[in-house]
């Protein structure tokens, strides 16, 4: 394009009927000649450039059909939270589904794959200091572990197969933060839309990990300045404007939720010894 941004022939957005997908749809207008919207549920209200596809990406053949003619992917589909700690359900949707998506993308010659990862990939790092993108994974639970797998698979596809891969460790995606922890980990709808579009339109890159958070002055995570610059992500919102409403909403001092970055997700079902976690 004349302004230097990338333009794609067909962009695939999975999980398009979900909370994040519904926000991204209007933000992605004009980034591709056609935008394919995939979800388990029907996708309504199609714009002229949009096309819909319904199906379960963990079922045989669905990922391949979704990838037909696609050159850029935003993969949001999957179970978006701990799902009651059901590892089998999370494995099927988030591990098997993501594996099939990367395999289908590779076979179809997809150039760029943007993967919705999570801050819960690093949840069992002790709270009190920011966690960078190069530190080892310490997932909060089965959901976080599934996202670690997705990031690892993305790294493999970038290094071995030359696919451009961006992993977005999305924080608390809400209209406004709901507790004190989210004063550092919140991402606004506006900033999430900007981040996705920047990743789609950016010039060539290899492999990036970016924390999907707003410009929160109480930032919990960091080390991604170069990756943000590579795509041009400059968040505009700051959770601090909500601080007086929610900074008192916090777990008891010394609790598992207070001691680790993953908060309540780390605490749910916890039966270990927190003093042994360094």
Q: Which residue ranges define each predicted feature?
A:
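Conserved catalytic Lys-bearing alpha helix of Rossmann-like short-chain dehydrogenase/reductases
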Residues: 95-101, 110, 146-154, 192
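Conserved Rossmann-fold NAD(P)-dependent oxidoreductase catalytic core, especially the SDR/UDP-sugar
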Residues: 100-138
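Conserved C-terminal active-site "lid" loop/helix of NAD(P)H-dependent oxidoreductases
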Residues: 208-210, 217-234, 238, 245-275
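Catalytic helix-loop patch of NAD(P)-dependent Rossmann-fold dehydrogenases
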Residues: 92, 126-162
